[in-house]
Amino acid sequence: MSEAEARPTNFIRQIIDEDLASGKHDHIQTRFPPEPNGYLHIGHAKSICLNFGIARDYQGQCNLRFDDTNPVKEDIEYVESIKRDVEWLGFSWSGDVRYSSDYFDQLHAYAVELIGKGLAYVDELTPEQIREYRGTLTAPGKNSPYRDRTVQENLALFEKMRNGGFAEGTACLRAKIDMASSFIVMRDPVLYRIKFADHHQTGNKWCIYPMYDFTHCISDALEGITHSLCTLEFQDNRRLYDWVLDNITIPCHPRQYEFSRLNLEYAIMSKRKLNQLVVENVVEGWDDPRMPTISGLRRRGYSASSIREFCVRIGVTKQDNNVEMAALESCIRDDLNENAPRAMAVLDPVKVVIENLPAGHEEFVAMPNHPNKPEMGSRQVAFSREVYIDRADFREEANKQYKRLVLGKEVRLRNAYVIKADRIEKDEQGTITTIYCSYDAETLSKDPADGRKVKGVIHWVSAAHAVPAEFRLYDRLFSVANPGAAEDFLSTINPDSLKITQGFVEASLAQAEAEKAYQFEREGYFCADRVYSSAEHLVFNRTVGLRDTWVG
């Protein structure tokens, strides 16, 4: 990681600087606590870069802890994908991977402690009644008829819950706080609920599972977290975070700090809605290159460094704001413009026959792998009597603004010769099948000797050496900036989010490595797809175009 990435400034880092300077802490301990119920997305990348980046920069530690308290929605598949994503982004967690389920015994003991202090009770209201009794933002809640059970009753009933004596939804453990609180989160929140489901870590040992708000703060405390960082929607939950830790016997009391979540335009960040896209086959899977998941972005061709740079550029604040997709695309363009080797590919080919070259002619022309980086070397590219050019690079007639090949006029083939279009051949439908040209043999990488000006330059591949390839032209998955605001977000799907074409690439790409980025000259940035591409059938994903086509 570069120094530019390493030390962004934000209000959280200022707090940490003050805590270290005052002696409040002598080391920094953070954590990244995802729930393993889906794949990580670009919003999680912001949290990863923040938590792991702080630990790195302050010579501290960052734990990877899975918040695995809901066995119904969680799966080991998501655990493994999250670990891969964190490592791919360039970060390492401290020690072993941790799970909230590691602390189920301690959590249960702390629940018993709260019951013993008269601060928790077993409630037998139905979930619907609990919602009804909770009240609203403008009306206070009302006490459950089970709220004033004795400590002995609650201990016995909680043990009954633990032993499977209640059906799901018929009993829960609630904190005894204040049903008239102006903060709904403090109106006797549920601490434990019943779920008869096998857990991916603990099997069937438990049939009661702690809620997030109870688990999160205690797990932080048990791990000695100094700064518990979460997004703004948990701001009110900080009161419950502190209440739990203030009322149990635990030596450490971390502090929670909130920052704005990432809202990326033309994308969905809700795991539920992302899952719907997968389940309803709107996309191929969680790693579909149109998805905002880290695995999807990686498959599309985004680099880890470009995602880290994006997180630096958007910063960490307390104000929610929408980030333009162009900001993310700018990061990968900047990265690949600097680092991606160049190559030639023709996505919509039409054949050019150079008639004043002999049949079987073959020569090799030198091409730089990067125009501004001679240290990246060069390659020899075959040139022959027949080449492919892109269909959009030829017109029978054109105005002066068109700087490509026109019937009766000249253009330069990139790093090769000047050619002139003499005649064309069409099929029965009127589609051009062949363009017959002549070439100027004295113009290999130099201007014509007679001083005539040839302004246009187009890319090409030798027909005799070209390798067939499929090109997947990905675009934004949604056609509106805020699809989540639509009544039916699926109605805002961009019908042109994927176009597939068949064409050719130069021979040097025959063994293209999966996810290795290239700039296909004049076309955009591409990488070989890690799922579909093979030596027998090359498939390239367009990561991003050379410029933003959504401007205006």
Swiss-Prot record:
Motif stretch ('KMSKS' region): 268-272
Residues given in the record as L-glutamine binding sites: D67, Y212
Location in the cell: Cytoplasm
Reactions it catalyzes: tRNA(Gln) + L-glutamine + ATP = L-glutaminyl-tRNA(Gln) + AMP + diphosphate
UniProt keyword annotation of Iron present: no
Keywords: Aminoacyl-tRNA synthetase, ATP-binding, Cytoplasm, Ligase, Nucleotide-binding, Protein biosynthesis
ATP-binding is among the record's keywords: yes
GO BP: any one term: glutaminyl-tRNA aminoacylation
Highest taxon in the source lineage: Bacteria
Record-linked NCBIfam families: glnS, PRK14703.1
This protein's name: Glutamine--tRNA ligase
Organism (species): Pectobacterium carotovorum subsp. carotovorum (strain PC1)
Lineage: Bacteria, Pseudomonadati, Pseudomonadota, Gammaproteobacteria, Enterobacterales
Gene (UniProt): glnS
